[in-house]
Design a protein with these regions (language model features):
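Terminal amphipathic alpha-helical/low-complexity segments used for targeting or macromolecular assembly
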Residues: 1-80
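Structural signal for interior beta-strand "rungs" in well-ordered beta-sheet cores
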Residues: 77-163
Length: 163
């Protein structure tokens, strides 16, 4: 987990809930117990094959994931208590928090965070690097621009045909 600051602990718990990672470590300049600094991130391959940025800022998260994907596999992390439709597309570097719901036919683009208890209704397009904070509702057939950030409990309806 790279460049995580406070959000990293939450992301670690999400990754642990998936039960598929043997070891989860941090690379960060400000985290006690990190395995290394940000400038050393390239040196941990092949011991670590997966890496994901967990920055609070969507643009920074996207930038880090683009850099990481040159060396590492970038996972999608989704909490075991989230619900993702089989027809939804979740792209690399996304983080789906507990009890989030992603509806059929929706696309969640790269490095987007879907917050706890958020709902992305069917047939939505959520752009790269978005941050949907807890309780956000994205109404059916909406399209969100790259880098959209919501506040808790926001309800959005931005029809695809108006984008």
């Amino acid at each position: 987990i790279v460049a995580s600051k406070r959000y990293g602990d939450y992301v670690k718990e999400i990754a642990e809930s998936m039960g598929c990672f043997e070891e989860i470590s941090f690379v960060d300049n400000d985290r006690e117990g990190a395995i290394g600094k940000l400038e050393e991130v390239d040196t941990f391959y092949p011991e670590y094959r997966y890496a994901i940025a967990a920055c609070d800022d969507g643009e920074e998260r996207l930038k880090w994931n683009k850099r990481l994907e040159m060396i590492y596999n970038i996972p999608v992390l989704f909490h075991k208590d989230s619900t993702i439709s089989p027809s939804a597309e979740i792209q690399l570097g996304c983080i789906v928090e507990p009890r989030a719901v992603i509806g059929c036919g929706s696309t969640i683009c790269q490095a987007t965070v879907v917050g706890a208890n958020s709902v992305v209704e069917p047939y939505c397009l959520v752009g790269d690097g978005c941050t949907l904070k807890s309780g956000t509702i994205v109404k059916s057939t909406s399209a969100l621009n790259i880098g959209t950030e919501t506040e808790q409990g926001t309800v959005l309806f931005t029809p695809l045909d108006k984008q």
